[in-house]
Amino acid sequence: MLYSVLAISLGASAGAVSRWLLGLGFNTLFPTIPPGTLLANLLGGYLIGIAVTFFAANPNLPPEWRLLVITGFLGGLTTFSTFSAEVTTLLQQGRLLWAGGAIAVHVIGSLVMTLLGMATMSLLQRS
């Protein structure tokens, strides 16, 4: 249990710092739909596609690795709560089209990126 908690904590710390750095680096470019949040979610979608495929192909790895990467790092990197707050702000400002666009780009984009991550691993496993 202790190793699981440590793995999740280490991964979550690295993921949260990565998300914060993406926000610092990109959110000033286009504050209406902060690109740091979008990049974190799209990158997280891609990486979870890779991770799920990798761990499915390597079931003998200790479970702490999956906890570190998926529950910890990707849980800290991706940010549904920030996305929700940003969309709510757009709705409160009456920017319905922007809110709808943000929802579409985050949700559809993350799903597409997850599929691309899985496809990447499929291609790598063939070679």
Swiss-Prot record:
A cellular component term from Gene Ontology for this protein is:
plasma membrane
Q: Which residues bind Na(+)?
A: G75, T78
- Answer yes or no on keyword Transmembrane: yes
Q: Does the keyword Protein biosynthesis apply?
A: no
Annotated catalysed reactions = fluoride(in) = fluoride(out)
- Provide the GO biological process annotations: cellular detoxification of fluoride
Bilayer topology reads: Multi-pass membrane protein
Where on the tree of life does the source sit, at the highest rank? Bacteria
Q: How is its activity regulated?
A: Na(+) is not transported, but it plays an essential structural role and its presence is essential for fluoride channel function.
Sorted alphabetically, the keyword list is: Cell inner membrane, Cell membrane, Ion channel, Ion transport, Membrane, Metal-binding, Sodium, Transmembrane, Transmembrane helix, Transport
Where does it localize?
A: Cell inner membrane
Pfam families given for it?
CRCB
Q: What is its main location?
A: membrane
Question: What is the purpose of this protein?
Answer: Fluoride-specific ion channel. Important for reducing fluoride concentration in the cell, thus reducing its toxicity.
The family line of this record is: Belongs to the fluoride channel Fluc/FEX (TC 1.A.43) family.
Name of the molecule in the record: Fluoride-specific ion channel FluC
What is the organism lineage in this UniProt record?
Answer: Bacteria, Pseudomonadati, Pseudomonadota, Gammaproteobacteria, Aeromonadales
The gene it comes from is fluC
